[in-house]
UniProtKB/Swiss-Prot annotation:
EC class: transferase
Pathway this chain belongs to: Amine and polyamine biosynthesis; ectoine biosynthesis; L-ectoine from L-aspartate 4-semialdehyde: step 2/3
Gene Ontology MF term list: acyltransferase activity, transferring groups other than amino-acyl groups; diaminobutyrate acetyltransferase activity
Name of protein: L-2,4-diaminobutyric acid acetyltransferase
Gene Ontology BP terms: ectoine biosynthetic process
Amino acid sequence: MTAAQADLQIDRPRVADGAALWRIARDSEVLDLNSSYSYLLWCRDFAATSAVVRDGHGVPVGFITGYVRPDSPDTLLVWQVAVDGTYRGRGLAATLVDGLADRVARERGITILETTISPDNTASQRLFTSFAERRGARLEREVLFDTAVFPDGPHEPEVLYRIGPLSAGG
């Protein structure tokens, strides 16, 4: 971690973190907000493929959630990345992506990282493009879910970013 991150700690989420993750996602005003229940389940069932960053008091101020795809055990899909507004600009999102990719590669042998990003989310586009560059990995993009498949009203398409093969962190 950098000097700007020195007072922070990254570890696996716990069920007790679910409400804070839900609030951080809600306050991001960019992410699709899932139910509070889903964040609680995520912290219980997918803690091994997710991470939380805590302030000096142990309070979550950022998170990354992901899972290993059941039909592609070499692939980590990153579901959401968010950092509390007061902690943005410190490189925490990149630290979370790098740290999670390294941990899951070490523990589960993943070589590919995937995520989906809507066309208007330029911050996430930059985050994952720079991740691919740091890893010297190929980045492929294709529309995974077009607007027409979303049943709940207008939704931008979700573009799949597929990054790999991954090399060790930089």
